[in-house]
């Protein structure tokens, strides 16, 4: 069963408002793991399905290893044999005709840009001096002239981490985005990630001050989480949960949409609520225990510093980031134990389950 969309009207209205205006910023959509960033963008795309002026290019990098330009372009483009295009370009400029082809074949929603093989041979060749991004700029310019509004969405941006050792593609990609948004105002660009450290790396490396903005998609607050439980239980279980049941669920998993959904699905399978929640917590405790065990085996001094840092969360769910030394907090963020909000300057566990695991595991410390 696929989880139905719920709420997020504030974020939806903000993004729809951005799309309605002239492009002027790159937008980083960030938040904890499984807070609903992708679901939100899919809902926005769904709401735009009848608006023929948009051309959305959505690239989900999940599960993809990217370590070179070639890897990235393999995701961005789909190469096809096209005999009609082959005949068309016999006596014409392949690049000019290519722009017309891309514009004509682009739909409202695209997970790749279709390239005829004859065009791909030219723009993806190793010829010195050819700039694929400049060519795409020409494509988007032509779309814009015809009243179309291109939108680029990069989901799971952190998958570009493999390029940190060869940062030229990150530079070129975000210079391209700056060109499309801040300079030419022809294309909206959104980048989604739960890795706020990598977002900050990109922000600094690509010199995006004054050229980028942030939209937080956080876990639900308590009031919204309880309403979400009502929504799911009525839809999936055909009944309402009691107030005590909802409070119990929230005490274990908080407002993380995926965790709440998993609880309701397991209830549908006939499992007892307390058993479901205890199992989820035990699983999280074991993950944290083994993580700490690995750290201790490698570096006991680091282990002690991490335990000291995590103990701060025994009494607080969210703290100021500088309460934990920079190298320790960044280590815990990279390991997905903590989530850093770089705008608010705060740290919190990636989920209520992680928070509860920290409190249980460190109870004797």
From Swiss-Prot:
Keywords: ATP-binding, Nucleotide-binding
Organism field: Methanocaldococcus jannaschii (strain ATCC 43067 / DSM 2661 / JAL-1 / JCM 10045 / NBRC 100440)
PANTHER family: ATPASE DOMAIN-CONTAINING PROTEIN (PTHR34301:SF8), DNA-BINDING PROTEIN-RELATED (PTHR34301)
Family statement: Belongs to the archaeal ATPase family.
InterPro entries from the UniProt entry: AAA+_ATPase, ATPase_dom, MJ1010-like_2nd, P-loop_NTPase, WH-like_DNA-bd_sf
Designated name of the protein: Uncharacterized ATP-binding protein MJ0075
Gene Ontology molecular-function annotations: ATP binding; ATP hydrolysis activity
Residues reported to bind ATP: 31-38
């Amino acid at each position: 069963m696929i989880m139905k969309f719920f709420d997020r009207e504030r974020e939806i209205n903000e993004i729809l408002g951005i799309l309605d205006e002239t492009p002027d910023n790159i937008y980083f959509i960030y938040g904890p793991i499984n807070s609903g960033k992708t679901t939100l963008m899919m809902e926005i795309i769904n709401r735009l399905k009848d608006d023929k002026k948009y051309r959305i290019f959505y690239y989900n990098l999940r599960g993809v290893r990217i370590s070179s330009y070639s890897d990235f372009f393999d995701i961005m483009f789909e190469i096809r044999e096209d005999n009609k295009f082959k005949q068309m370009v016999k006596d014409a400029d392949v690049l000019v005709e290519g722009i017309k082809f891309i514009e004509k074949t682009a739909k409202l929603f695209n997970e790749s840009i279709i390239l005829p093989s004859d065009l791909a041979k030219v723009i993806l060749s190793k010829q010195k001096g050819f700039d694929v991004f400049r060519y795409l700029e020409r494509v988007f310019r032509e779309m814009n002239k015809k009243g179309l509004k291109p939108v680029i969405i990069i989901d799971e941006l952190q998958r570009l981490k493999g390029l940190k050792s060869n940062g030229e593609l990150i530079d070129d990609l975000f210079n391209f985005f700056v060109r499309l948004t801040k300079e030419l105002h022809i294309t909206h660009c959104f980048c989604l990630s739960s890795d706020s450290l990598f977002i900050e790396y990109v922000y600094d490396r690509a010199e995006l001050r004054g050229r980028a903005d942030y939209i937080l998609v956080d876990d639900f607050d308590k009031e919204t989480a309880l309403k979400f439980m009502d929504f799911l239980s009525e839809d999936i279980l055909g009944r309402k949960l009691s107030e005590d049941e909802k409070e119990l669920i929230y005490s274990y998993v908080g407002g993380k949409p995926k965790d709440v959904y998993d609880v309701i699905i397991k209830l549908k399978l006939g499992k007892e609520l307390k058993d479901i929640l205890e199992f989820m917590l035990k699983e999280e405790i074991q993950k944290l225990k083994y993580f700490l065990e690995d750290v201790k085996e490698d570096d006991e001094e680091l282990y002690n510093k991490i335990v000291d840092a995590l103990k701060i969360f025994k009494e607080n769910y969210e703290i100021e980031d500088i309460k934990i030394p920079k190298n320790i907090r960044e280590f815990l963020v990279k390991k997905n134990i903590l989530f850093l909000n770089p705008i608010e300057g705060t740290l919190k566990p990636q989920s209520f389950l992680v928070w509860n695991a920290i409190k249980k595991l460190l109870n004797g410390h």
